[in-house]
Amino acid sequence: MMDPAATSFWATPVGWTLVTAGQILAVMIWILLSLAFLLLADRKIWAGVQMRKGPNVVGPFGLLQSFADFLKFVLKEIVIPSGADKTVFLLAPLISFTLAFAAWAVIPLAPGWVVSDINVGILYLFAISSLGVYGIIMGGWASNSKYPFLGSLRSAAQMVSYEVSIGFIIITVILLAGSMNLQQIVASQTGGFWNWYVFGGPGGLAKLPLLLVMVPMAVIFFISGLAETNRPPFDLPEAESELVAGYQVEYSSTPYLLFMIGEYANIVLICAMTTILFFGGWSAPFPSDFTDSWAPTAASFYYFMWFFLKVIFFFFLVSMAKAIVPRYRYDQLMRLGWKVFLPFSLVCVALIAAWRVFGPAAAA
């Protein structure tokens, strides 16, 4: 039995701070380790599409390649252009890195496995993602070079354009779930894949008309997430054939590494958000009442594995898009966001709102 004095210590502000710091550290370590192997998988998939082997020298099957790259970046010299604003130049990648990891504070990995279970989790995520553009703009401006500056301007326009559509899509999920708490959104989709919001959410046969709305919304959300994170085929802010490396042209060593880690953390975050909002989060595709007899920790690991498998699946789609889809022109990118996704998502918000007011759920 736990000592009452120890129990009372963890209830104090100091104990709570230590517990929260431990949770944050555990989540950061999991994200960094996941990124190391997901980045390797990304390179392997790209190589496989091109009929190459990919990284296969460092460690068995190349599994340690990402760790070798980490050491390479950390041990290199930090080169700062002579005309750059040194303070802003070094602050920009730190902001991007910090915001990318701060967003994970509200992501539920399993029942109860969340650093901060706030009731406005979706609003928090939307705010954090909106702030991410500042690091890119600061990096492009502080470099005092035309290519980084053009890349940062492209990134700002691109992120703002697609955030509007993402916001409307999130509203449709909020209307169906009746909550902005991410754990409650996942909990409302338990009971089988037919209760996931991509299929209209819980409600039996009465919710079948919602399929015509929610399936396209899930697809648009995922595509908009690619544009939001500057991933191919929407990697115009760092298009090699036009801008060399975009806003990252003048960066090297650790600052470049921070930008890259922040970018991939955001990519995995989009995969996690797609999983949570439309594909049931940590819930299994089929009812899993047998976990009721399990120990809480074992059940949590079971649900966490489902969450992680779904995230890996969407990351695979991201990697395949990079390998097989050609890059959009800038005018095509803007047209897709403003003339296709935005009007469609706005109409879908109106349809979901009407369903909530006049549909079977309202009549019940």
Swiss-Prot record:
GO terms of biological process kind: aerobic respiration
Domain of life: Bacteria
Entry's EC annotation: 7.1.1.-
Presence of keyword Iron: no
Cell location: Cell inner membrane
Membrane topology: Multi-pass membrane protein
Family: Belongs to the complex I subunit 1 family.
UniProt name for this protein: NADH-quinone oxidoreductase subunit H
